[in-house]
């Protein structure tokens, strides 16, 4: 009997213990969620590296505890060090690292615009897509669309394949995916980002003062990186909107190996939604697919896109790690049309494809870090156009732009003094670009292939003073272009000074070069949809692009109120007239020169309880000199948008998020015709002075909302151009078959709704 009672008591004890344990487990939440709660409750911001926080569970913070007690409790639970600074910023570091000084990529402004966007020392703007709450006009996170909300980023044509940063053209930006250069940056030929936001942990925008380890990008760098999640459980996510379906998987394959995989495919070749129809009309309005085209009527158009990415991480030991990356991006358009009232259907197609793969090795021991990467990438754009001549299908034009790039990158970092780091490395790049045309009837073939091999050595010193009052980096990059037997020396500098507790002053400077650029041979190339083609410098009529830039920034932060002001001067030498996209008297000119840009960027951001408001203003003055044109005088570039203003507000209410934004800017330049004498004697259009007129001002309002379910699901609604404002993005003129002048306007995207649904496991 006594034994039975003891057994019963023991069972009760176990049962109570299980209940207690279950209750405690239910109270456990992810550390990153606990930090979000503390930030809202106590008006502080945390500075941390993503890999420090992954998959750590803690007790749910109590509402009535002081911030100091909360941090002490988190220290006990996580064994991480929490350092509270005077400005309300909290530095999180591993305990074993806290005994020595580490020169951090310090966050100086956190959660600007929306959660997940921060400004770091050196002017680097960092975006963590998987922390996004909401941005106006977006139903789902979009990496490159998000960048366009930032100061200094303008887009005259409102396409992701034509992003302008501080007056530069799109090809002057360096897009890196896991350190591999990307030559294709848009789905739907420039309306959707092709990079999955649910695997990319961090996106960095660098406009100036970049590290010497980066080559290319005379205008800016957009860097996208995957990172190991260290998860012990499989994570799966599915999502859809009115354009595509997508899924991702993060799973441990073993204790030392992790797989990250994502895939997305448009269903636009099967189902056409209002979003698809509006996107289609926007992109193809100047092509044969335009239903208003009097000479060509398109039928049977089928368009789709897909992207696939995968990363495998393997940890041999604490010192040695391996990473393998794979990416495939594809856009495909097929359609048939009738020409000149002939009922015969003529097939045409246009495709873009990117393939990239790399192997990365990482070594870390004490104060030394070493990274090595081997990579290969291939980009191709191919089109087939069939033309009817005299009612017969007897002319076919095939065009191709092909890039193959491979190379080696070695990078080391050594901390040889407490507050001094030395970075060093070597990069080898082989870039080959082919441009080919094949015409049937009359027979014509053109095949041009250029290859440039570049060797680069780089080194950099970084210093951080006591109490983080001063931080500075100075670096040098030496490029040797083997084909031209040319050396190019590129200094880089970044200086940061903190004063009066709330103010930060920053000076940045750099020199850069690049051998790739985009040109337009004929407006109707590649169906007139993506008519730019990549080329290589030949050090003759296509010079190596070289840039110089300096900037000065002042930043102020007091609790949740932020003001930043930054001014810059930039010059790029080696620009060509064929890269500018002229549609006037300079359309077929072939000369080169330089471009000058100067400007001011302002950001005002405030958070009050659950409401965020921010204003961005940009002033830009962009002019270009091209030898032999415009009386050898500077004139405004096609990207010369002098003033732009954006007002944004977001509100968080329980599981709901709302965001609305108004975007305004002055009209871009265009070249008008001489109304007194519109035609020259040789039946060509008589233009006025180049880019001496401006389009009407641009205005657009965007709206978004989403709701997060407790079962890790989310539904979202976005409306792009809520007021359906009619904006003209470009105006140019052509002659028809009767030598009458036609005015052609390119219109912006009208009111476009989108709905998304996502669920994660």
Residue ranges and their predicted role:
Residues 348-360, 401, 450, 502-504, ...:
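Outer-membrane beta-barrel signature, preferentially recognizing the C-terminal barrel domain
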Residues 415-423, 427-431, 441, 445-571, ...:
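Structural signature of Gram-negative outer-membrane beta-barrels, strongest in the C-terminal barrel
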Residues 567-571, 590-674:
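Gram-negative outer-membrane beta-barrel transporters
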Residues 243-267, 285-332, 351-370, 414-424, ...:
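Transmembrane beta-barrel wall of Gram-negative outer-membrane proteins
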Residues 268, 274, 611, 664-681, ...:
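C-terminal beta-signal and adjacent terminal beta-strands/loops
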Residues 75, 119-168, 179-193, 202-210:
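Periplasmic N-terminal accessory/gating domains of Gram-negative outer-membrane beta-barrel systems
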Residues 150, 194-235:
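A beta-strand signature from Gram-negative outer-membrane beta-barrel systems
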Residues 35, 39-42, 85-134, 170:
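Short, acidic, small-residue-rich periplasmic hinge/interaction motif at the N-terminus
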């Amino acid at each position: 009997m006594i034994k039975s009672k003891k057994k019963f008591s023991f069972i009760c004890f176990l049962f109570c213990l299980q209940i207690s344990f279950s209750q405690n487990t239910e109270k456990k939440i992810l550390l990153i969620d606990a930090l979000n709660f503390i930030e809202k409750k106590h008006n502080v911001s945390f500075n941390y590296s993503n890999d420090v926080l992954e998959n750590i569970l803690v007790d749910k913070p109590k509402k009535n505890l002081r911030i100091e007690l909360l941090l002490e409790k988190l220290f006990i639970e996580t064994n991480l060090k929490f350092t509270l600074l005077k400005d309300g910023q909290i530095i999180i570091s591993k305990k074993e690292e806290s005994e020595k000084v580490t020169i951090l990529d310090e966050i100086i402004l956190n959660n600007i615009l929306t959660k997940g966007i921060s400004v770091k020392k050196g002017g680097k703007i960092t975006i963590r897509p998987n922390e996004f709450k909401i941005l106006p006009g977006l139903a789902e996170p979009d990496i490159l669309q998000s960048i366009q909300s930032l100061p200094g980023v303008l887009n005259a044509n409102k396409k992701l394949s034509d992003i302008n940063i501080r007056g530069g053209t799109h090809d002057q930006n360096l897009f890196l995916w896991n350190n591999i250069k990307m030559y294709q940056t848009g789905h739907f030929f420039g309306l959707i980002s092709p990079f999955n936001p649910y695997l990319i942990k961090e996106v960095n925008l660098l406009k100036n003062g970049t590290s010497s380890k980066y080559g290319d990008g005379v205008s800016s760098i957009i860097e996208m990186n995957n990172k190991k999640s260290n998860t012990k459980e499989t994570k799966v996510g599915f999502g859809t909107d009115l354009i595509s379906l997508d899924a991702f998987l993060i799973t441990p394959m073993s204790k030392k190996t992790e797989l990250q995989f994502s895939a997305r495919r448009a269903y636009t070749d099967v189902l056409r939604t209002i979003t698809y129809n509006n996107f289609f009309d926007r992109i193809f309005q100047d092509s044969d697919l335009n239903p208003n085209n009097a000479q060509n009527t398109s039928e049977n158009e089928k368009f789709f896109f897909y992207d696939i990415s995968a990363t495998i991480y393997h940890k041999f030991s604490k010192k040695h790690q391996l990473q393998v990356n794979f990416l495939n991006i594809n856009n495909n358009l097929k359609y048939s049309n009738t020409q000149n009232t002939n009922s015969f259907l003529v097939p045409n197609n246009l495709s873009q494809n990117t393939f990239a793969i790399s192997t990365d090795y990482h070594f870390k021991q004490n104060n030394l870090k070493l990274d090595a990467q081997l990579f290969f990438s291939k980009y191709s754009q191919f089109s087939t156009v069939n033309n009817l001549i005299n009612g017969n299908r007897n002319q076919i034009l095939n065009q191709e732009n092909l890039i193959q790039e491979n190379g080696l990158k070695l990078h080391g970092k050594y901390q040889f003094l407490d507050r001094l780091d030395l970075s060093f490395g070597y990069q080898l790049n082989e870039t080959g670009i082919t441009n080919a045309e094949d015409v049937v009837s009359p027979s014509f073939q053109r095949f041009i292939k250029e290859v440039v091999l570049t060797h680069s050595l780089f080194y950099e010193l970084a210093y951080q003073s006591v109490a983080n009052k001063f931080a500075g980096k100075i670096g040098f990059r030496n490029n040797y272009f083997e084909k031209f037997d040319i050396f190019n020396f590129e200094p880089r500098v970044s200086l940061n000074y903190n004063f009066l507790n709330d103010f930060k002053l920053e000076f940045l400077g750099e020199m850069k070069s690049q051998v790739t650029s985009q040109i337009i041979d004929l407006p109707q190339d590649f169906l007139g949809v993506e008519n730019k083609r990549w080329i290589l410098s030949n050090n003759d009529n296509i010079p190596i692009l070289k840039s110089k830039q300096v900037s000065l920034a002042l930043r102020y932060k007091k609790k949740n109120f932020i003001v930043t002001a930054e001014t810059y001067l930039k010059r790029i030498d080696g620009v060509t007239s064929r890269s500018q996209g002229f549609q006037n008297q300079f359309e077929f000119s072939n000369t080169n020169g330089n471009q000058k840009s100067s400007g001011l960027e302002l950001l005002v951001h405030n958070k009050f309880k659950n409401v965020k408001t921010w204003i961005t203003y940009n002033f830009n003055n962009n002019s270009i000199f091209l030898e032999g044109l415009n009386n050898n005088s500077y004139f405004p570039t096609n990207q010369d948008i002098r003033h732009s203003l954006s007002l944004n507000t977001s509100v968080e209410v329980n599981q709901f998020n709302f965001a609305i934004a108004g975007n305004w800017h002055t009209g871009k330049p265009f070249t008008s015709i001489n109304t007194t004498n519109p035609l020259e004697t040789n039946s060509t259009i008589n233009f006025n002075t180049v880019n001496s007129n401006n389009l009407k001002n641009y205005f657009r309002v965007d709206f978004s909302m989403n709701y997060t379910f407790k079962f890790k699901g989310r539904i979202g609604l976005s409306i792009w151009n809520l007021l359906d404002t009619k904006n003209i993005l470009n105006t140019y003129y052509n002659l028809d078959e009767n030598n009458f002048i036609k005015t052609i306007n390119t219109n912006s995207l009208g009111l476009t709704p989108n709905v998304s649904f996502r669920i994660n496991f």
